[in-house]
Swiss-Prot record:
Quaternary assembly: Heterodimer of HisH and HisF.
Keyword Oxidoreductase: no
Taxonomy, superkingdom: Bacteria
Organism of derivation: Streptococcus sanguinis (strain SK36)
Function: IGPS catalyzes the conversion of PRFAR and glutamine to IGP, AICAR and glutamate. The HisH subunit catalyzes the hydrolysis of glutamine to glutamate and ammonia as part of the synthesis of IGP and AICAR. The resulting ammonia molecule is channeled to the active site of HisF.
GO cellular component: cytoplasm
Gene Ontology biological process terms, A to Z: L-histidine biosynthetic process
Name assigned to this protein: Imidazole glycerol phosphate synthase subunit HisH
CDD domains: GATase1_IGP_Synthase
Keyword terms: Amino-acid biosynthesis, Cytoplasm, Glutamine amidotransferase, Histidine biosynthesis, Hydrolase, Lyase
Pathway: Amino-acid biosynthesis; L-histidine biosynthesis; L-histidine from 5-phospho-alpha-D-ribose 1-diphosphate: step 5/9
InterPro entries given in the database record: Class_I_gatase-like (IPR029062), GATASE (IPR017926), Imidazole-glycPsynth_HisH (IPR010139)
Record EC number: 4.3.2.10, 3.5.1.2
Domain Glutamine amidotransferase type-1 as annotated: residue spans: 1-206
Length: 207
């Protein structure tokens, strides 16, 4: 069973629908015991970094997520969920993140002819491979975001060009992030969720 973490940050119905398409048994939950008992976790999200972290704190889920990862639980952050994986974010001041991947979430700089938010389809460029990134070079996926994850190169798997290399996928150990929306990215996005499913159940078999 996978748990989609519930913290009122939107797009959960689309994520659950996409997981069902790749035959993943999943449900939405904010229950700490269910999160800690899950085979894998998905942290979706749209909205503002500080508001999301405040809601995770209010629900007592920050330490729960950190404990689940420390226990070896695979975690996939999507869009805002990926940004929250970092140490901090600079939206409306500086806020602490989950601290699972080193880095800072920064606003995409204003550039001529490139509106912010970065919205729509963009092509992926491979930087290094991970369990989720096979056959992604040149594939097109759907983005909607105004902030990007500034992470050390060792955690950067895939980028998209938007005047600067925008981190599209990152990972550290069993923690993965997609800045784009796999649930809105057609067959390519479903393929990434399928790979996460395979990774989760390979991980489960080791315990």
């Amino acid at each position: 069973m996978m748990i989609v973490i519930d913290y009122d940050a939107g797009n959960t119905a689309n994520v659950l629908r996409a997981l069902a398409q790749v035959r993943v048994e999943a449900r939405l939950s904010a229950d700490p015991q269910e999160i800690l008992a899950a085979d894998g976790l998905i942290l979706p999200g749209v909205g503002a970094f500080p508001t999301a972290m405040q809601e995770l704190e209010r629900r007592g889920l920050v330490s729960v997520i950190q404990q689940a990862v420390a226990d070896g639980k695979p975690l996939l952050g999507i869009c805002l969920g990926m940004q929250l994986l970092l140490e901090s974010g600079l939206e409306n001041g500086q806020s602490s993140g989950l601290g699972l991947i080193p880095g800072v979430c920064r606003r995409i700089p204003d550039q001529a002819g490139l509106p912010v938010p970065h919205m729509g389809w963009n092509d992926l460029q491979m930087q290094q491979s991970s369990a989720l990134t096979a056959s992604l070079e040149g594939q097109s996926v759907y983005f909607v975001h105004s902030y990007y994850t500034d992470v050390p190169e060792e955690y950067l798997d895939v980028t998209a060009d938007y005047g600067l290399p925008i981190p599209a996928m990152i990972h550290r150990g069993s923690v993965f992030g997609c800045q784009f929306h796999p649930e809105k990215s057609g067959a390519v996005g479903l393929g990434i969720l399928e790979k996460f499913k395979e990774y989760v159940y390979e991980n489960t078999a080791r315990y």
